[in-house]
Amino acid sequence: MEGLTLSDAEQKYYSDLFSYCDIESTKKVVVNGRVLELFRAAQLPNDVVLQIMELCGATRLGYFGRSQFYIALKLVAVAQSGFPLRVESINTVKDLPLPRFVASKNEQESRHAASYSSDSENQGSYSGVIPPPPGRGQVKKGSVSHDTVQPRTSADAQEPASPVVSPQQSPPTSPHTWRKHSRHPSGGNSERPLAGPGPFWSPFGEAQSGSSAGDAVWSGHSPPPPQENWVSFADTPPTSTLLTMHPASVQDQTTVRTVASATTAIEIRRQSSSYDDPWKITDEQRQYYVNQFKTIQPDLNGFIPGSAAKEFFTKSKLPILELSHIWELSDFDKDGALTLDEFCAAFHLVVARKNGYDLPEKLPESLMPKLIDLEDSADVGDQPGEVGYSGSPAEAPPSKSPSMPSLNQTWPELNQSSEQWETFSERSSSSQTLTQFDSNIAPADPDTAIVHPVPIRMTPSKIHMQEMELKRTGSDHTNPTSPLLVKPSDLLEENKINSSVKFASGNTVADGYSSSDSFTSDPEQIGSNVTRQRSHSGTSPDNTAPPPPPPRPQPSHSRSSSLDMNRTFTVTTGQQQAGVVAHPPAVPPRPQPSQAPGPAVHRPVDADGLITHTSTSPQQIPEQPNFADFSQFEVFAASNVNDEQDDEAEKHPEVLPAEKASDPASSLRVAKTDSKTEEKTAASAPANVSKGTTPLAPPPKPVRRRLKSEDELRPEVDEHTQKTGVLAAVLASQPSIPRSVGKDKKAIQASIRRNKETNTVLARLNSELQQQLKDVLEERISLEVQLEQLRPFSHL
């Protein structure tokens, strides 16, 4: 302070500003308090503001003392005058004007302040103007503004008509007038002396009581009235009682008032009681907002994406935190885009904030999309309001309010802050926004929930089992319906946990093979599929007999019989039950497999062990065609198929030789035999189901689906040796078949259990991690807020 020389006007002006910013009267102004608003009103780039804070020493101290504050104000004036920003410039620059602070809501006042700044030293009254903005509510300040404004308003009173009539065009042509207008609302009575403006600028107190008159005048000039009344809320209250102050002081006061948005908002609320809802959008404003919307989105029924809205609203030069709060309020449906109603609400909030109103915590009812009447606004398309943005602040729709002009002025500068918009969502005024993002980002839990249904979806109901399997036979991989697949691959098991259980239960309910019930609708198709699988070595889709077996004597003979059986199966698919009973005595393995699809197979199982075994083998065969069609699963079920084939080889020596014959024919035949063995195991499972071992039947079927041709070949060789065995051996092996099936089912159930447990653990872990992520993000937000408080200009 020692080296700082101030004129009387500067001394008074700076002292008033310091008193205004020193809310707690501690002689130490917090960096992130009103000083932040004051420097924002200076309309300097962020880097310049930071440099000023650095030069004055506030950054180092963490607060503004009186000396730091005065130096900062001097540096602001230096920067605004275009001189190099150095401490030496404070005293070297002669006739340095007073710093100009343009509150967004009162750009007009800011212009007045600028004009005063040119006469700063002559305007010792400046100090009087600046009595701390908190005094906005005070009568003194308001009264001063009225008298001082009157001389200017006289000129303005004439001008206002044009801006009112054509707010868009007139503001650009007479921006000063517009500024004055907005000032007049603040200084309400300044124009009373003038007959024309009188009604417009009646003192605020009168404006409240006689606002209707003012409105009527404005109605003559539709666009301005909303602005006047709207903007005047903050400024007019003091003006109503005060008419004695000098115009210069009044202007200064108005600028300061605009800076003190908090106190102004409080008074606005008090004094707006007699007014209409301050958040209500007038027709003129609606028209302007709609026109602005059309410039971005021609379709009024369309929406503006978040990126376009960001670019548009950053031109308002509002802080990122405030823009983020406005976005939260206006994006009513949280879809990341703005409809016409939402855009109008957002625009209205921006205008209100530029005019010094505090943003509401919740979206006012009058701005709710459902309550916003935009019907007429759609027709308003001529207003060049957006041009006003890029052009002059005055262009900002007069209909909106003086605040709009301020938006226009700062529009190009606001583009600078567009880069910071990215922080918009991150820096949302409250951590709740981020929490919402987390909840949206954290649909991991929903995903897991979806994952569980996936297996259910993959396992169709019994009604659709047949069609699903028939289709899947064409595309082998998608065979989740069969629980056997669960065994071959754990992944399938997880997806099929529910399906396998349902499938088994369904089979048991359906007489040992509920799938047969589901298949009963198309037993012929099933039989054909079975024959296909048996003849799969020949890869013939039809029920035609399989290709001739290799030169192996026994296999060929058994193969021929099996082929005959297949033919009979195709013929008797509809009569599988009766055929099953007749065939078991002749050749238990082949005839029964073709007949197995029918529930009769289970009946033979119950009736006799032989019949059951033969029926199981036929059942296995028919089921295998369904499963055998899933050639892609052979790789997975190879091991299971081999085990089952071994068991069945012991159980059904005759059936095994028949399969051997098919195996030598080709690797495909081997796959057929594997499918047959799988079918056998499946058949044994249904047999068990009928006996009361229903759960066993379903799992073996899918597991025994063709997996690896090589593995299958090996078991087939064993089967050939076993096939040489007698039917007695087969009968003896029959009990072992259900046992093996039981073992298989137990293994499958165990794997399902393990997979379920693993899935549960992972789901819990996922939810815990999501919660941790939320906590971390919230902590990050709080830290960022603290950091911004310590470095308030980092986000300007």
UniProtKB/Swiss-Prot annotation:
Instruction: Point out residues bearing the modification Phosphoserine.
Output: 143, 145, 162, 166, 170, 272-273, 307, 475, 482, 489, 540, 562, 709, 740
Which residue stretches does the UniProt record annotate as biased composition, category Polar residues? 115-126, 145-156, 407-433, 506-543, 563-574, 612-623
**Cited Gene3D superfamilies:** EF-hand
- List residues of the EF-hand domain: 318-353
SUPFAM superfamilies found in the cross-reference section: EF-hand
What range does the record give for the signal peptide?
none
Q: Gene Ontology terms, cellular component aspect?
A: clathrin-coated pit; cytoplasm; cytosol; intracellular membrane-bounded organelle; nucleoplasm; plasma membrane
Q: What does the record list as GO biological process? A: endocytosis; endosomal transport
Keyword Coiled coil attributed: yes
Known partners and oligomeric status: Homodimer (Potential). Interacts with RAB11FIP2. Interacts with RALBP1, CRK and GRB2. Binding to RALBP1 does not affect its Ral-binding activity. Forms a complex with the SH3 domains of CRK and GRB2 which may link it to an EGF-responsive tyrosine kinase. Interacts with AMPH, ITSN1 (via SH3 domains) and SGIP1; may be involved in clathrin-mediated endocytosis.
Q: What is this protein called?
A: RalBP1-associated Eps domain-containing protein 1
Which lineage? Eukaryota, Metazoa, Chordata, Craniata, Vertebrata
